């Protein structure tokens, strides 16, 4: 088995997944890890073009991200996936694919729908609340919170840097990255 692993950031739109991932990644690189990012929007654009937002299409999108992450993990990469991935069963499938080659670290980025709506610069929540967008996760489509993620980051009242520190500390505890030596 390689020394690769996957961090799977899951949470509502606007919870802070990508923001925190973009802080964690450079820290992993600083500690000698080769990092690859699979952002949900980029995966949808490049690997899942043409898919909609039905449950089946969302599952297909996440399974594709999981397959790519498993291959990168097999090659020793530190893979950071940031995707809403709303359904527990599909996250479990991704976990199974990835754990064949290395650890899967589920990182639940937790924020209320209200907080996410306040952070929403695209106005998607407002449109979903008005019924202009159907099937919006957390509004009229479910988000199944993880039962036992390896990391839970409650972002309300924390800066993105403080949230990233929670993830880094847990990776140190799990032995996936060397502990930071402070003088």
Question: What residue ranges belong to the model's regions?
Answer:
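Extreme N-terminal, non-catalytic leader segments
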Residues: 1-6
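Hydrophobic anchor at the beta1->P-loop junction of P-loop NTPases
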Residues: 9
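Conserved lysine of the Walker
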Residues: 17
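Conserved beta-strand scaffold positions in the cores of enzyme catalytic domains, especially
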Residues: 37, 104-106, 150-152
């Amino acid at each position: 088995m390689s020394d690769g692993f996957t961090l799977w950031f899951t949470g509502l739109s606007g919870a802070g997944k990508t923001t925190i991932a973009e802080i964690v990644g450079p820290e992993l690189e600083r500690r000698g890890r080769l990092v690859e990012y699979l952002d949900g929007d980029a995966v949808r654009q490049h690997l899942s073009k043409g898919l909609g937002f039905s449950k089946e299409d969302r599952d297909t999108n996440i399974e594709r991200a999981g397959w790519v992450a498993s291959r990168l993990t097999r090659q020793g990469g530190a893979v950071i996936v940031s995707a809403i991935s709303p359904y527990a069963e599909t996250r479990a499938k991704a976990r199974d694919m990835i754990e064949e080659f290395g650890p899967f670290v589920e990182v639940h980025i937790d924020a209320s729908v209200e907080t996410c709506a306040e952070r929403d610069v695209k106005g998607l929540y407002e449109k979903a609340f008005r019924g202009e967008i159907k099937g919006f996760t957390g509004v009229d489509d479910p988000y199944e919170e993880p039962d036992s993620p390896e990391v839970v980051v409650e972002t309300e009242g924390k800066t993105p840097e403080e949230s990233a520190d929670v993830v880094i500390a847990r990776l140190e505890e799990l032995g996936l990255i060397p502990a930071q030596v402070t003088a």
